[in-house]
Amino acid sequence: GGDECNINEHRSPQETLPDVPHCANINLLDYEVCRTAHPQFRLPATSRTLCAGILEGGKDTCHR
């Protein structure tokens, strides 16, 4: 776990936006935890990448 942040979905101007914006509170994860959990992404040992979400799966801005 870690700190929590609020994300909002941004879509292409060509897409129709819903009446209610999609947003979710997600957890910011330690980068090394994310890197270990997702070796298929071949993340570098150090990065300025933000890793956020729930390792077990859950809501994100694409959740319907």
From Swiss-Prot:
Keywords: Disulfide bond, Fibrinogenolytic toxin, Hemostasis impairing toxin, Hydrolase, Protease, Secreted, Serine protease, Toxin. Expressed by the vanom gland. One of its GO terms (cellular component) is extracellular region. GO terms for molecular function: serine-type peptidase activity; toxin activity. Disulfide bonds join 5-23, 34-51. It is found in: Secreted. The keyword Protein biosynthesis does not apply. The keyword Transmembrane does not apply. GO terms for biological process: proteolysis. Its main location: secreted. Monomer. Belongs to the peptidase S1 family. This is Thrombin-like enzyme collinein-4. It comes from Crotalus durissus collilineatus.
